[in-house]
Amino acid sequence: MRVPVFEDIKDETEEEKIGEEENEEDQVFYKPVIEDLSMELARKCTELISDIRYKEEFKKSKDKCTFVTDSPMLNHVKNIGAFISEAKYKGTIKADLSNSLYKRMPATIDSVFAGEVTQLQSEVAYKQKHDAAKGFSDYAHMKEPPEVKHAMEVNKHQSNISYRKDVQDTHTYSAELDRPDIKMATQISKIISNAEYKKGQGIMNKEPAVIGRPDFEHAVEASKLSSQIKYKEKFDNEMKDKKHHYNPLESASFRQNQLAATLASNVKYKKDIQNMHDPVSDLPNLLFLDHVLKASKMLSGREYKKLFEENKGMYHFDADAVEHLHHKGNAVLQSQVKYKEEYEKNKGKPMLEFVETPSYQASKEAQKMQSEKVYKEDFEKEIKGRSSLDLDKTPEFLHVKYITNLLREKEYKKDLENEIKGKGMELNSEVLDIQRAKRASEMASEKEYKKDLESIIKGKGMQAGTDTLEMQHAKKAAEIASEKDYKRDLETEIKGKGMQVSTDTLDVQRAKKASEMASQKQYKKDLENEIKGKGMQVSMDIPDILRAKRTSEIYSQRKYKDEAEKMLSNYSTIADTPEIQRIKTTQQNISAVFYKKEVGAGTAVKDSPEIERVKKNQQNISSVKYKEEIKHATAISDPPELKRVKENQKNISNLQYKEQNYKATPVSMTPEIERVRRNQEQLSAVKYKGELQRGTAISDPPELKRAKENQKNISNVYYRGQLGRATTLSVTPEMERVKKNQENISSVKYTQDHKQMKGRPSLILDTPAMRHVKEAQNHISMVKYHEDFEKTKGRGFTPVVDDPVTERVRKNTQVVSDAAYKGVHPHIVEMDRRPGIIVDLKVWRTDPGSIFDLDPLEDNIQSRSLHMLSEKASHYRRHWSRSHSSSTFGTGLGDDRSEISEIYPSFSCCSEVTRPSDEGAPVLPGAYQQSHSQGYGYMHQTSVSSMRSMQHSPNLRTYRAMYDYSAQDEDEVSFRDGDYIVNVQPIDDGWMYGTVQRTGRTGMLPANYIEFVN
């Protein structure tokens, strides 16, 4: 291990030597200090003081530091620190040893001369030893370990020079199945061909339990909705019969004006091309492109003269004519630019006052895409603090989805073992059923290719002639880079700013031709100077380029099949010789149709142990691989299973690939091999390196970040294409729903994050934000809801007849639920109306110490009424005690109350929860009256002092507050959570009367806010 301190120490010693050589004549040797008792005492005191200060600093910094457990990295740092401290200690010891007593003596002539001679001799000996040992290092004699050998081989494979050399070497093909180039071509074709992958998946997985699943059907519908082609087809079908009877865009004058504006916009665009981003093209500088460019230059003069002769007699129309202005106004109203402006105004975004150039718009969009602050603001506004009510985001739903995936994999493997392997079947390509399936898939794929050719290639203006793939690619790239952007610039730069364009003049045509030739030349020049010369990599992931690549592949496959059919008709059938069988096997392995089947099926030789092992591994990881291929389009990282499989395949097959390459048998160059070779030459090293970077777990280095930023800033076509595709249609609710569903479908990311976070606690501060998050999580959690749902599932409910007791319980439940969940208290509205109801209501009551005992006017009436009420109350207590002792506890409360109310009409029953009458509460029957007209009871009170006189009763209950409550009226009391309420007396179903022990206040309080304390 290299310790950087050694170099520092060496530098320090060298500096000391240089300083000593410079100051040898000026040195003064001091006398050593004699160590006596005072020096020893001072040394010990210094050590004690330093120890005390160290402990004080340790105590002060104790609260500022966080102690963590010893991780491997921390132990490594400790060991390095120990080595560094030991090296420094040895360095100081050597420096002290060099200052010996002999050296402190005065320098004499002999000592100085001896020192110089010794130094010269040491330098000469050092140089001789260095020259003798030059070229003999320890590394040259060491054996090369396997790790170093493997690292060197990986480095060679990753280098660009070695890669190109290996590409040339692998152009000789053999009949082996596991060659790296064949596997890479197969993998890339599968990744690019999404439609073929889905078709192959549908052919292989024919189980109704897999195909008919709701999530699969939902994913298919989501892909159809998100497809722009399907959206345009649906729009055309719906709007076919809704066109306007008069379309000003189809008039001759408007078309002429539009053509002139297009040509003028081309001139304007080419004129300002130096002020904007330099255009970038990923087309290679091929010989036939140069030939085409030179030919176009030679023909441009002739074409220019021909068009000049044809346009001699044409006249120019007036741009300010009434008809032209009318068409221009209609075009502005119908244009997409107007809709976008109205959409931006409706969104509330202010329009900038200065002119927005295309370069400024591209820079602004790039800043928005790269800005992390915008994402955080959207997160704060839209997500943070809002409770999620979607069922798809609950932990239970994610867990169920994860278990479903596991069960599906298990079921798939189980069916494979039971139906195929368990019945002794061999997956051989020569079985009649497999041959028939192959033939059917070939016919279906051929039909699909023709359909794609008609709809994608011919329907979009491309010519499916005998041109090569490079020519088609160049044509498509030219269309993308010119027509689409020029038309958009026409709408935004010229028409939107009220500019008037002249007609199709001679100068405009000449400028158009010259700009086209200059643009092609400028693109190639910028490509060589700006991109290739600076080591930048051209991105192949542009949607337009991907679509062009897809088109070229479809056409190449169709052309290949046509050539194969022509070749079949030119040959006669002969007996298969070993050479022909070997060539057939090679063609089957290279064929694109064979890639859609399982790798290894249809071999004409006996399977070796290595091939059987590869087959079993592919069968075991097939279900995971298919799912992971879908996830290549998502923004999530590779799961651990896929990473492990990739690493295993790389580690296992490195040596095997080389051996198979050496065992390759050269064959003649067939048309299939020629086509494969051309396709491999077109696949650049950028694609492979990009895939390697996506597979590594390191962050992007500064050079890669700079290259990415430069690519984004330089590529003007890319930004314009992205902006155009992002604003061609408005965001419909279906599109938003599809986006949300696609984000919610993938549960692998959430489960992986959950597994990684499991068992890794971290100490964080208990901030108010964290408390808020905890409370929100507790409220959002539906675990309790699902638990209760599972308990009551299938039990059903028994309908009962509504009686007064059930009605009262239902209303109480409604009050409690409103108060607990919604924060709505229905009794507040009734309390606001209570003072008006209580006015002028008088109820006769008396108690010891009541004011009524001193009133001479009402004494007789009060005495008679209270005497009758007291007799009824005593009789009621005796009757209830006898009925309670003779009956069981299960008697309904509604029946008891009905009987009591029939016998004693003047009594009013209280809540069954408190039962104050059986405990002898001092509430007389006439003290309160209950009204059931509105479902809530009203308390008619006449004297507060008479209520306070009842606090001395020894049998009153004590309650504790469960929530905070603020008094809404004068006769109510306020309390907090945890307060004790004494002398509680029930009034009706929803209200009680009591005294708060903490404040000493007495008044009414809600019954659902307190709980009984034994």
From Swiss-Prot:
SMART domains per the record? NEBU, SH3
InterPro entries (alphabetical): NEBU/NEBL, Nebulette_SH3, Nebulin_repeat, SH3-like_dom_sf, SH3_domain
Chain positions with Omega-N-methylarginine modification = R795
Signal peptide interval = none
Q: Name one GO biological process term.
A: cardiac muscle thin filament assembly
Q: Where is this region: Linker?
A: 836-953
Q: What does the UniProt function comment say about this protein?
A: Binds to actin and plays an important role in the assembly of the Z-disk. May functionally link sarcomeric actin to the desmin intermediate filaments in the heart muscle sarcomeres.
**Lineage of this protein's species?**
Eukaryota, Metazoa, Chordata, Craniata, Vertebrata
Region span, Disordered? 1-24
Does the UniProt entry include the keyword Repeat? yes
- Protein biosynthesis found in the keyword field: no
Assembly, per entry? Interacts (via nebulin repeats 1-5) with DESM (via rod region). Interacts (via SH3 domain) with XIRP2.
Organism annotation: Homo sapiens
Q: Where are the Nebulin repeats?
A: 29-63, 64-99, 100-136, 137-172, 173-205, 206-241, 242-278, 279-313, 314-348, 349-385, 386-422, 423-459, 460-496, 497-533, 534-569, 570-599, 600-635, 636-666, 667-693, 694-728, 729-759, 760-794, 795-830
Q: Which GO terms describe its cellular component?
A: extracellular exosome; I band; stress fiber; Z disc
Q: PROSITE patterns of this UniProt entry? A: NEBULIN, SH3
Give an example GO molecular function: structural constituent of muscle
From the Swiss-Prot or TrEMBL record, give the protein name: Nebulette
Q: Taking every annotated instance into account, which residue ranges of this chain make up the domain SH3?
A: 954-1014
Q: In which tissues is it expressed?
A: Abundantly expressed in cardiac muscle, but not in skeletal or smooth muscle. Localized to Z-lines in cardiac cells and to dense bodies in nonmuscle cells. Isoform 2 is expressed in non-muscle cells such as in fibroblasts.
Identify the keywords attached in UniProt to this record, alphabetized.
Actin-binding, Cytoplasm, Methylation, Repeat, SH3 domain
